[in-house]
Amino acid sequence: MSTDATLSFEEAMEKYDPVLGFEVHVELNTKTKMFSSAPNVFGDEPNTNVNEVDLGMPGVLPVVNKTAIESSIKIGLALNCKIAETCRFARKNYFYPDTPKNFQTSQYDEPIAYDGYLDIELSDGTVFRVEIERAHMEEDAGKLTHMGGSAGRIQGADYSLVDYNRSGVPLVEIVTKPIQGAGSRAPELAKAYVAAVREIVKNLGVSDAKMERGNVRCDANVSLRPHGRERFGIRSETKNVNSLRAVEHAVRYEIQRHAAVLDSGEPVIQETRHWHEDTRSTTSGRAKSDADDYRYFPEPDLVPIVASREWVEELRATLPEPPAERRKRLQADWGYSDLEFRDVVNAGVMDEIEETIAAGATATVARKWWMGEIVGRAKNADVDPGQLGVKPETIVELNKMVEAGKINNKMAAEVLDGVLAGEGTPAEIVEKRGLAVVSDDGPLLEAIDAALAAQPDVADKIRGGKVQAIGAIVGGVMKATRGQADAGRVRELILERLGVEG
């Protein structure tokens, strides 16, 4: 049987128990790189933020970025980890074009933080504890871009380009212990865990935490074992999954794939795999290496790091409000019900709503736009809401137009679609598409007269006191004006025309 065949998720859950493990890589937002003075800036021209240390030129020596160490300690504390009094760097040796030194400076058996945990709240309020094995410091690799072939993949590419701007960017890798007992909620837990880590590092201010930029990337490990068996199965590792939705889908897919392999009687291969968003599937990468294959040894050019207890406590005192407490405060500040706030958190738009309120919207308006308009569009596009790129200022501008009577809610939704299509600002789109509300009563009265003439029975009902029947007339006027009338003003004019009190 092909290792890419799958069973249904329900069939897999009937037979097997999933065991998960995650390695989340967090890029730190320091001004310079981990071991060099080269700038740590996203989006610059390729190979412009590189120096001789990043390229491993002969005779150069690395210098540790103190801010990166402090950020790493803060992450460890926020994950309820113990902070090592002494830790050291190690060389992880492998040969790949994105690693010009032919080794990555990382940490092996002496990480800076270890033995922590994170309590994860699922969509129904269930709390699941994920134990943290370690959080260690390392440097990022460069970025390869595969040219030609299919969708930028290495398979079938004509050649590859390498950008070393990312080489040497400081990373913290957070590694969980095996996660057992999630059962059919494993995909949901995967998404919620990565979301919680992202929220923590963003809250700490140590990372921009934008998954679409690769600031937070997840390697998801999955294995299956028959129900009742203690021994773990063979695992696969899906590399560099870079959205919350993709993490959930990748774990679900791998559970189904493993189940199909095991049902066929074939062994699961221990390997890395690549996630493809377009097909929602993984493909084989390479056989998974053990630590011995990397020939780790202590970095001879860097002395051990000593994190005194005084230093650690000073950093602990600077930690911001924990995310769980922040959520409680925001819910109280915004006046959302438990259900409303849980929906906001589950939709992943809490930060966006907070930013929209800070830009000038009320809590009610911000929730209306994000939950009522943007979340649905994100689902249709199969992306996370934040990936749509809607700015808080755009929401505020749109809502002001509605409140001022320049456009109605239907037009505002059309303008939002224009913004997402890159047509410009809300004001520019309104002008280009001719979406202004009809404010002249003359054309409205003409449309009202036509609608009343077309539905005399409805007009009689309204005159007779059944004012609720007015909706049919309003609908006719809105259709005649192509939705460009103010429904409230139309209602007023209809009642005036019929001599009925509102």
Swiss-Prot record:
GO biological process annotation, one example: translation
Q: Does the keyword Cell membrane apply?
A: no
The cross-references to NCBIfam families, in alphabetical order and at most eight, read:
gatB (TIGR00133), PRK05477.1-2 (NF004012), PRK05477.1-3 (NF004013), PRK05477.1-4 (NF004014)
Designated name of the protein: Aspartyl/glutamyl-tRNA(Asn/Gln) amidotransferase subunit B
**One example GO MF annotation:** asparaginyl-tRNA synthase (glutamine-hydrolyzing) activity
Name the keywords, alphabetized.
ATP-binding, Ligase, Nucleotide-binding, Protein biosynthesis
Could you say which enzyme class this protein belongs to? ligase
Catalyzed chemical reaction(s)? L-glutamyl-tRNA(Gln) + L-glutamine + ATP + H2O = L-glutaminyl-tRNA(Gln) + L-glutamate + ADP + phosphate + H(+); L-aspartyl-tRNA(Asn) + L-glutamine + ATP + H2O = L-asparaginyl-tRNA(Asn) + L-glutamate + ADP + phosphate + 2 H(+)
Q: Which Pfam families match?
A: GatB_N, GatB_Yqey
EC annotation? 6.3.5.-
Question: Organism, per UniProt?
Answer: Arthrobacter sp. (strain FB24)
Record's family?
A: Belongs to the GatB/GatE family. GatB subfamily.
Q: Which InterPro entries match?
A: Asn/Gln-tRNA_amidoTrfase_suB/E, Asn/Gln-tRNA_Trfase_suB/E_cat, Asn/Gln_amidotransferase, Asn/Gln_tRNA_amidoTrase-B-like, GatB, GatB_Yqey_C_2, Gln-tRNA_amidoTrfase_suB_CS, Gln_synth/guanido_kin_cat_dom
Quaternary structure, from the entry: Heterotrimer of A, B and C subunits.
Q: What does this protein do?
A: Allows the formation of correctly charged Asn-tRNA(Asn) or Gln-tRNA(Gln) through the transamidation of misacylated Asp-tRNA(Asn) or Glu-tRNA(Gln) in organisms which lack either or both of asparaginyl-tRNA or glutaminyl-tRNA synthetases. The reaction takes place in the presence of glutamine and ATP through an activated phospho-Asp-tRNA(Asn) or phospho-Glu-tRNA(Gln).
